[in-house]
UniProtKB/Swiss-Prot annotation:
Gene3D superfamilies: Glutamine synthetase/guanido kinase, catalytic domain. PROSITE patterns: PHOSPHAGEN_KINASE (PS00112), PHOSPHAGEN_KINASE_C (PS51510). It comes from the Bacteria. It comes from Caldanaerobacter subterraneus subsp. tengcongensis (strain DSM 15242 / JCM 11007 / NBRC 100824 / MB4) (Thermoanaerobacter tengcongensis). ATP binds at residues 11-15, 76, 110, 161-165, 192-197. This is Protein-arginine kinase. The keyword ATP-binding applies. A motif (RDXXRA motif of the pArg binding pocket involved in allosteric regulation) lies at residues 321-326. InterPro entries: Arg_Kinase, ATP-guanido_PTrfase, ATP-guanido_PTrfase_AS, ATP-guanido_PTrfase_cat, Gln_synth/guanido_kin_cat_dom. Pfam families: ATP-gua_Ptrans (PF00217). Residues 8-239 form the Phosphagen kinase C-terminal domain. Belongs to the ATP:guanido phosphotransferase family. GO terms for cellular component: extracellular space. NCBIfam families: PRK01059.1-4.
Length: 337
């Protein structure tokens, strides 16, 4: 069993939605008001007398290339919506990529903390610390009865969105995935693909999060998500165990073929990589393959279109990307540590 349940949980995320008092929401504010929010955020973090002031790098969307913006989206450091806000979109990203503060997305501020494995409490502690630091210099839009005021009604209240990214290959192979996801939806959780709302569950990877933030404390919301995550972890592990016991040869064949193609292919699309990666990741946690799990998880971000082009330092058309992706994956998987 891996530390922090990393065999099933890829990452844990806490995101806090906050708005500045007396400034209209980003959907209706002027460009000047957007610039004011940026200055307030800069002062709160970069101007603070804490060690944190030296640990963040600022990113103005208008100064980034489309490729740079997309690379940040692929790393889950900014949202697709923020990447499209060229006029007033801005982000402060911690140098170790664990925290990002998105400015002028759907809300004035979205404080996000992402950590590997099941670490919701640690993610919350970090996000809460940043939130407190910002609140020292910014007056938030807050109502005594309702809580934090947000652009979208589903975020009103605590303004917290807690989520886990889970890899569920065995539940998918055994046909149990629909029942599991339906059960999760019925208890008020949202289920999305790897890049959030409206995205596909590529590579059997799903994002589970709370839907509503009103009427519950931050602690209750986090405990609910953690409880659901632990049930899903148990179901997936049980499915893996039964699958390997009943279909050992077929699973070893499936994993071996997937690894063979990943490590030797000459052309590979993102979608094909994600499908094969899912089988290889299953093979690693079942002990069939001795590939480093963290290395494979890093690779899954590195081979996404924008990050791949940044690694090679050149613009590539779709076919060239598929060739370079196969080359990069092969090099990484065949490299002796």
């Amino acid at each position: 069993m891996l530390q922090y349940d990393k065999d099933v949980v890829l990452s844990s995320r806490i995101r806090l939605a906050r708005n500045v008092k007396d400034i209209p929401f980003p959907t209706v504010m002027t460009e000047e008001q957007g610039k004011k929010v940026i200055e307030l955020a800069r002062k709160a973090i970069l101007g603070s007398n804490t060690i944190l002031s030296t640990q963040f790098t600022e990113y103005e969307m208008k100064k980034l290339t489309p490729l740079d913006r997309q690379a940040l989206v692929e790393k889950h450091l900014i949202s697709p919506d923020l990447s499209q806000n060229i006029k007033t979109g801005y982000a402060l990203i911690k140098d170790d990529n664990t925290v990002s503060i998105m400015v002028n997305e759907e809300d004035h501020l979205r404080i996000q903390c992402i950590l590997p494995g099941l670490k919701l409490d640690e993610s919350w502690d970090m996000a809460d610390k940043i939130d407190d630091l910002i609140e020292e210099t910014i007056d938030y839009a807050y109502d005594e009865k309702i809580g934090y005021l947000t652009s979208c009604p589903t975020n009103v209240g605590t303004g917290i969105r807690a989520s886990v990214m889970v890899h569920l290959p065995a539940l998918t192979i055994t046909g149990q995935i629909s029942n599991i996801l339906n059960s999760v939806s019925k208890i008020g959780m949202a289920v999305r693909g790897i890049y959030g709302e409206g995205t596909q569950a590529l590579g059997d990877i799903y994002q589970i999060s709370n839907q509503v933030t009103l009427g519950q404390s931050e602690k209750e919301i986090i405990e609910n998500i953690e409880g659901v995550a632990k049930q899903i972890i148990s179901s997936e592990r049980r499915a893996r165990e039964e699958l390997y016991k009943k279909q050992r040869v077929q699973i070893e064949d499936r994993v071996g073929r997937a690894f063979g193609i990943l490590s030797h292919a000459k052309v590979m699309s993102t979608k094909e990589y994600m499908t094969l990666m899912s089988d290889v990741r299953l093979g690693i946690v079942l002990g069939i393959l001795s590939v480093d799990l963290d290395k494979l998880d890093r690779l899954t971000t590195q081979i996404q279109p924008a990050n791949l082009q940044k690694i090679y330092g050149m613009q590539l058309n779709p076919y060239e990307r598929d060739v370079k992706r196969a080359e990069y994956v092969s090099t990484q998987l065949n490299k002796k540590e």
